[in-house]
Amino acid sequence: EGRLRLDEPVSRYIPNFATARVAVTTDSGRALVPVHRAVTIRQLLTQTAGLSYGTEPLIRDDYRAAGLGPAAGYGWYLADKAEPICATMDRLGTLPLAAQPGEAWIYGYATDVLGCVVERASGVALDRFFQQRIFGPLRMRDSWFFPPAPEAGRLTAVYAVTPEGTLVRAPDGPLGQGDYIVGPRQDFSGGAGLVSTAGDYARFLQMLLNGGELDGARILSPATVALMTAPAVDSLYYTPGMAFSLGFEVLQNPGEAGEYGSIGRYGWAGAY
Protein backbone atom coordinates (compact mmCIF):
# COMPACT_ATOMS: atom_id res chain seq x y z
CA GLU A 1 0.00 0.00 0.00
CA GLY A 2 3.02 2.28 0.19
CA ARG A 3 2.27 3.56 3.68
CA LEU A 4 5.70 2.65 5.07
CA ARG A 5 9.24 2.95 3.73
CA LEU A 6 12.02 0.88 5.25
CA ASP A 7 14.44 3.77 5.47
CA GLU A 8 12.09 6.48 6.72
CA PRO A 9 12.62 7.75 10.27
CA VAL A 10 10.63 6.25 13.11
CA SER A 11 10.05 9.79 14.37
CA ARG A 12 7.45 10.22 11.62
CA TYR A 13 5.22 7.97 13.73
CA ILE A 14 6.72 8.43 17.21
CA PRO A 15 8.00 12.04 17.36
CA ASN A 16 9.99 11.54 20.58
CA PHE A 17 12.55 9.53 18.60
CA ALA A 18 13.50 12.72 16.71
CA THR A 19 15.56 13.81 19.72
CA ALA A 20 17.07 10.39 20.51
CA ARG A 21 20.30 10.34 22.51
CA VAL A 22 22.85 7.61 23.16
CA ALA A 23 24.33 6.89 26.60
CA VAL A 24 28.14 6.73 26.55
CA THR A 25 30.75 6.28 29.26
CA THR A 26 32.88 9.29 30.18
CA ASP A 27 35.62 9.96 32.72
CA SER A 28 33.02 11.50 35.01
CA GLY A 29 30.48 8.72 34.52
CA ARG A 30 27.96 9.12 31.72
CA ALA A 31 26.97 11.48 28.95
CA LEU A 32 24.08 11.53 26.50
CA VAL A 33 25.19 12.30 22.96
CA PRO A 34 23.09 12.94 19.82
CA VAL A 35 22.51 10.09 17.39
CA HIS A 36 24.65 10.13 14.24
CA ARG A 37 21.64 9.21 12.12
CA ALA A 38 17.89 8.89 12.61
CA VAL A 39 16.42 5.62 13.83
CA THR A 40 14.68 3.97 10.86
CA ILE A 41 12.04 1.31 10.27
CA ARG A 42 14.71 -0.94 8.74
CA GLN A 43 16.85 -0.67 11.88
CA LEU A 44 13.88 -1.68 14.02
CA LEU A 45 13.33 -4.76 11.85
CA THR A 46 17.01 -5.74 11.97
CA GLN A 47 17.43 -4.96 15.69
CA THR A 48 20.13 -2.38 14.93
CA ALA A 49 18.25 0.69 16.19
CA GLY A 50 20.30 0.87 19.39
CA LEU A 51 17.29 -0.15 21.48
CA SER A 52 17.76 -2.72 24.23
CA TYR A 53 15.61 -3.89 27.12
CA GLY A 54 17.28 -1.36 29.39
CA THR A 55 19.49 -3.84 31.22
CA GLU A 56 22.79 -2.02 30.60
CA PRO A 57 24.19 -0.23 33.69
CA LEU A 58 24.36 3.12 31.85
CA ILE A 59 20.61 3.22 31.14
CA ARG A 60 19.07 0.87 33.71
CA ASP A 61 17.93 3.64 36.05
CA ASP A 62 16.29 5.56 33.19
CA TYR A 63 14.25 2.50 32.26
CA ARG A 64 13.34 1.78 35.86
CA ALA A 65 12.08 5.34 36.36
CA ALA A 66 9.96 5.02 33.21
CA GLY A 67 8.45 1.71 34.37
CA LEU A 68 10.12 -0.26 31.58
CA GLY A 69 12.45 -3.23 31.39
CA PRO A 70 13.41 -5.91 33.91
CA ALA A 71 14.79 -3.24 36.25
CA ALA A 72 11.22 -2.01 36.76
CA GLY A 73 10.02 -5.50 37.65
CA TYR A 74 7.89 -6.01 34.55
CA GLY A 75 10.04 -8.56 32.78
CA TRP A 76 10.95 -7.77 29.19
CA TYR A 77 7.48 -7.57 27.75
CA LEU A 78 4.58 -5.16 27.92
CA ALA A 79 1.40 -7.23 27.81
CA ASP A 80 0.80 -6.66 31.53
CA LYS A 81 0.31 -2.91 31.12
CA ALA A 82 -3.04 -1.11 31.07
CA GLU A 83 -2.05 1.69 28.69
CA PRO A 84 -2.13 1.70 24.87
CA ILE A 85 1.07 0.46 23.24
CA CYS A 86 1.79 3.85 21.68
CA ALA A 87 1.67 5.55 25.10
CA THR A 88 4.38 3.13 26.23
CA MET A 89 6.41 3.67 23.06
CA ASP A 90 6.09 7.47 23.32
CA ARG A 91 7.73 7.14 26.74
CA LEU A 92 10.37 4.75 25.41
CA GLY A 93 11.31 7.34 22.78
CA THR A 94 12.52 9.69 25.52
CA LEU A 95 14.97 7.15 27.00
CA PRO A 96 18.66 6.83 26.08
CA LEU A 97 19.69 4.32 23.43
CA ALA A 98 22.30 1.67 24.24
CA ALA A 99 24.21 2.22 20.96
CA GLN A 100 24.28 4.42 17.90
CA PRO A 101 21.61 3.41 15.36
CA GLY A 102 23.03 1.12 12.69
CA GLU A 103 26.29 0.43 14.55
CA ALA A 104 25.43 -2.57 16.76
CA TRP A 105 23.03 -5.52 16.88
CA ILE A 106 21.16 -5.33 20.17
CA TYR A 107 17.98 -7.28 20.86
CA GLY A 108 15.36 -5.21 22.61
CA TYR A 109 12.12 -3.28 22.27
CA ALA A 110 12.47 -2.64 18.53
CA THR A 111 9.63 -4.98 17.55
CA ASP A 112 7.40 -3.45 20.22
CA VAL A 113 8.09 -0.05 18.66
CA LEU A 114 7.04 -1.49 15.30
CA GLY A 115 3.67 -2.39 16.81
CA CYS A 116 3.05 1.29 17.51
CA VAL A 117 4.29 2.23 14.03
CA VAL A 118 1.72 -0.16 12.52
CA GLU A 119 -1.05 1.33 14.65
CA ARG A 120 -0.24 4.89 13.64
CA ALA A 121 0.39 4.13 9.97
CA SER A 122 -2.85 2.16 9.64
CA GLY A 123 -5.05 4.04 12.08
CA VAL A 124 -6.13 0.68 13.52
CA ALA A 125 -5.34 -0.86 16.92
CA LEU A 126 -2.83 -3.69 16.57
CA ASP A 127 -5.23 -6.41 17.73
CA ARG A 128 -7.79 -5.43 15.09
CA PHE A 129 -5.05 -5.03 12.47
CA PHE A 130 -3.88 -8.60 13.08
CA GLN A 131 -7.45 -9.87 13.00
CA GLN A 132 -8.34 -8.05 9.79
CA ARG A 133 -5.09 -8.56 7.89
CA ILE A 134 -3.75 -11.91 9.17
CA PHE A 135 -5.91 -14.02 11.49
CA GLY A 136 -9.18 -13.58 9.62
CA PRO A 137 -7.88 -14.26 6.10
CA LEU A 138 -5.81 -17.24 7.33
CA ARG A 139 -8.72 -18.64 9.35
CA MET A 140 -6.65 -18.51 12.54
CA ARG A 141 -9.65 -18.69 14.86
CA ASP A 142 -7.78 -19.32 18.12
CA SER A 143 -5.28 -16.44 18.14
CA TRP A 144 -5.66 -13.37 20.34
CA PHE A 145 -3.71 -11.01 22.55
CA PHE A 146 -6.25 -11.57 25.34
CA PRO A 147 -8.46 -14.67 24.91
CA PRO A 148 -12.22 -14.25 25.38
CA ALA A 149 -13.36 -15.37 28.83
CA PRO A 150 -15.03 -18.58 27.55
CA GLU A 151 -11.69 -19.69 26.10
CA ALA A 152 -9.66 -19.20 29.29
CA GLY A 153 -10.14 -22.81 30.38
CA ARG A 154 -8.29 -24.01 27.28
CA LEU A 155 -5.01 -22.41 28.36
CA THR A 156 -2.39 -24.91 29.44
CA ALA A 157 -0.80 -24.72 32.87
CA VAL A 158 2.95 -24.12 33.08
CA TYR A 159 5.22 -26.61 34.84
CA ALA A 160 8.88 -26.55 35.77
CA VAL A 161 11.47 -29.13 36.77
CA THR A 162 13.15 -28.70 40.16
CA PRO A 163 16.90 -29.31 40.65
CA GLU A 164 15.88 -32.70 42.09
CA GLY A 165 14.08 -33.60 38.87
CA THR A 166 10.55 -33.24 40.19
CA LEU A 167 7.85 -31.74 37.98
CA VAL A 168 6.00 -28.93 39.78
CA ARG A 169 3.38 -26.40 38.75
CA ALA A 170 4.83 -22.92 38.33
CA PRO A 171 3.54 -20.29 40.79
CA ASP A 172 0.51 -18.22 39.91
CA GLY A 173 1.17 -14.74 38.58
CA PRO A 174 2.34 -13.05 35.39
CA LEU A 175 5.74 -14.74 35.25
CA GLY A 176 4.67 -18.18 36.47
CA GLN A 177 1.33 -18.75 34.74
CA GLY A 178 1.16 -15.76 32.41
CA ASP A 179 -2.03 -14.39 33.94
CA TYR A 180 -1.37 -11.01 32.34
CA ILE A 181 -3.17 -12.42 29.30
CA VAL A 182 -6.46 -12.13 31.18
CA GLY A 183 -8.13 -9.20 29.48
CA PRO A 184 -9.48 -7.03 28.26
CA ARG A 185 -6.44 -4.76 28.05
CA GLN A 186 -5.17 -2.38 25.42
CA ASP A 187 -1.37 -2.66 25.36
CA PHE A 188 -1.08 -4.78 22.22
CA SER A 189 2.66 -5.29 22.06
CA GLY A 190 4.33 -5.82 18.71
CA GLY A 191 7.02 -7.91 20.37
CA ALA A 192 5.13 -10.39 22.53
CA GLY A 193 1.84 -11.37 24.09
CA LEU A 194 -0.13 -13.33 21.49
CA VAL A 195 -1.88 -16.53 22.54
CA SER A 196 -2.48 -19.17 19.90
CA THR A 197 -2.68 -22.88 19.16
CA ALA A 198 -0.26 -25.14 17.32
CA GLY A 199 -2.81 -25.47 14.52
CA ASP A 200 -3.21 -21.73 14.03
CA TYR A 201 0.53 -21.13 14.17
CA ALA A 202 1.09 -23.89 11.62
CA ARG A 203 -1.21 -22.06 9.20
CA PHE A 204 0.81 -18.88 9.66
CA LEU A 205 4.08 -20.72 9.03
CA GLN A 206 2.67 -22.49 5.97
CA MET A 207 1.70 -19.09 4.57
CA LEU A 208 5.35 -18.02 4.82
CA LEU A 209 6.57 -21.27 3.25
CA ASN A 210 4.13 -20.72 0.38
CA GLY A 211 5.59 -17.29 -0.33
CA GLY A 212 2.91 -15.30 1.48
CA GLU A 213 -0.30 -17.14 0.50
CA LEU A 214 -2.46 -19.91 1.96
CA ASP A 215 -5.75 -21.35 0.71
CA GLY A 216 -6.34 -18.41 -1.59
CA ALA A 217 -5.56 -15.75 1.02
CA ARG A 218 -2.63 -13.57 -0.04
CA ILE A 219 -1.03 -11.96 3.05
CA LEU A 220 2.38 -10.99 1.62
CA SER A 221 3.87 -10.86 -1.84
CA PRO A 222 6.59 -13.40 -2.69
CA ALA A 223 9.02 -10.48 -3.05
CA THR A 224 8.22 -9.30 0.48
CA VAL A 225 8.77 -12.77 1.96
CA ALA A 226 12.09 -13.03 0.09
CA LEU A 227 13.15 -9.62 1.42
CA MET A 228 12.09 -10.51 4.96
CA THR A 229 14.16 -13.70 4.98
CA ALA A 230 17.30 -12.49 3.18
CA PRO A 231 20.38 -11.81 5.35
CA ALA A 232 20.55 -8.10 6.17
CA VAL A 233 22.99 -8.01 9.10
CA ASP A 234 25.96 -10.35 9.33
CA SER A 235 29.12 -8.65 10.59
CA LEU A 236 27.20 -7.06 13.49
CA TYR A 237 25.35 -10.26 14.41
CA TYR A 238 26.71 -12.16 17.39
CA THR A 239 26.43 -15.78 16.20
CA PRO A 240 29.05 -17.19 13.76
CA GLY A 241 27.52 -18.69 10.65
CA MET A 242 24.28 -16.77 11.20
CA ALA A 243 22.88 -13.48 9.98
CA PHE A 244 19.80 -11.46 10.84
CA SER A 245 17.16 -10.43 8.33
CA LEU A 246 14.08 -8.22 8.69
CA GLY A 247 12.95 -10.00 11.84
CA PHE A 248 14.51 -13.46 11.51
CA GLU A 249 17.78 -15.22 12.24
CA VAL A 250 19.07 -16.78 9.01
CA LEU A 251 21.45 -19.74 8.78
CA GLN A 252 24.30 -18.99 6.37
CA ASN A 253 26.98 -21.56 7.23
CA PRO A 254 25.84 -24.68 9.14
CA GLY A 255 29.40 -25.77 9.85
CA GLU A 256 30.45 -22.42 11.25
CA ALA A 257 27.22 -22.14 13.22
CA GLY A 258 27.67 -25.65 14.61
CA GLU A 259 24.13 -26.80 13.98
CA TYR A 260 22.11 -28.87 11.55
CA GLY A 261 19.98 -27.14 8.96
CA SER A 262 19.81 -25.91 5.41
CA ILE A 263 21.38 -22.68 4.25
CA GLY A 264 18.69 -20.03 4.32
CA ARG A 265 16.75 -21.59 7.19
CA TYR A 266 15.10 -18.74 9.08
CA GLY A 267 13.25 -18.29 12.34
CA TRP A 268 13.45 -16.91 15.84
CA ALA A 269 13.09 -18.45 19.27
CA GLY A 270 10.04 -17.77 21.37
CA ALA A 271 9.96 -17.01 25.06
CA TYR A 272 7.45 -17.41 27.84
Where are these regions (language model features)?
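Acidic-enriched catalytic cores of C-N bond-cleaving enzymes acting on peptides and small amides
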Residues: 10
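Short, surface-exposed loop or secondary-structure junction motifs
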Residues: 15, 19-260
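Low-complexity, glycine/alanine/valine/leucine- and proline-rich hydrophobic stretches
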Residues: 259-272
